[in-house]
């Protein structure tokens, strides 16, 4: 089955796993998903992830979710730029999420990074998702 929005699918799987208090979630692997997971791990929203072989030459990511005092560290995670409606932002138009408590993840010419890093490096790009 073809998937029209692989990143949106991963975010939905994470959201569903959090609502069911799961410790891990499995999602198909891709380079973009790996970069987004790297940012989430670096910012402390997930414990980590492992690439596992699912057979037939395909790989999956096993994502270990992070909880603090029996509640998820991720309160909301939402897709912004979608396949039917791409959202691009310049450096000046990157807004803070929850007054700086959350992050936006952007795909820029310099790689996938947070809104803080994009402002520091003075680059804009596609606004992939917001996490709080």
Swiss-Prot record:
Report the sequence similarity comment from the record: Belongs to the universal ribosomal protein uS8 family.
Output this protein's name: Small ribosomal subunit protein uS8
From which source organism is this entry? Bartonella bacilliformis (strain ATCC 35685 / KC583 / Herrer 020/F12,63)
Which keywords fit this entry according to its UniProt record? Ribonucleoprotein, Ribosomal protein, RNA-binding, rRNA-binding
Supply one GO CC term from the record.
ribosome
Subunit structure of this chain's protein: Part of the 30S ribosomal subunit. Contacts proteins S5 and S12.
Q: What is this protein's function?
A: One of the primary rRNA binding proteins, it binds directly to 16S rRNA central domain where it helps coordinate assembly of the platform of the 30S subunit.
Q: Keyword Transmembrane: yes or no?
A: no
- Gene giving rise to this polypeptide: rpsH
So which domain of life are we looking at? Bacteria
Give the record's GO biological process terms.
Answer: translation
Q: Which GO terms of the molecular function aspect are on file?
A: rRNA binding; structural constituent of ribosome
Quote the InterPro entries the UniProt record gives. Ribosomal_uS8, Ribosomal_uS8_CS, Ribosomal_uS8_sf
């Amino acid at each position: 089955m073809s998937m029209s929005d692989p990143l949106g699918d991963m975010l939905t799987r994470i959201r569903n796993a959090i609502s069911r208090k799961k410790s891990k979630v499995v999602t198909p692997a891709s380079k973009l998903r790996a970069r987004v997971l790297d940012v989430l791990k670096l910012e402390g929203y997930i414990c980590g992830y492992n690439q596992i072989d699912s057979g037939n030459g395909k790989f999956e990511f096993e994502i270990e979710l992070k909880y603090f005092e029996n509640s998820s560290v991720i309160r909301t995670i939402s897709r912004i730029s979608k396949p039917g409606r791409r959202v691009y932002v310049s450096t000046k138009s990157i807004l803070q999420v929850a007054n700086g408590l959350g992050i936006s993840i952007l795909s820029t010419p310099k790689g996938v990074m947070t809104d803080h890093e994009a402002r520091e490096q003075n680059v804009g790009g596609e606004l992939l998702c917001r996490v709080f």
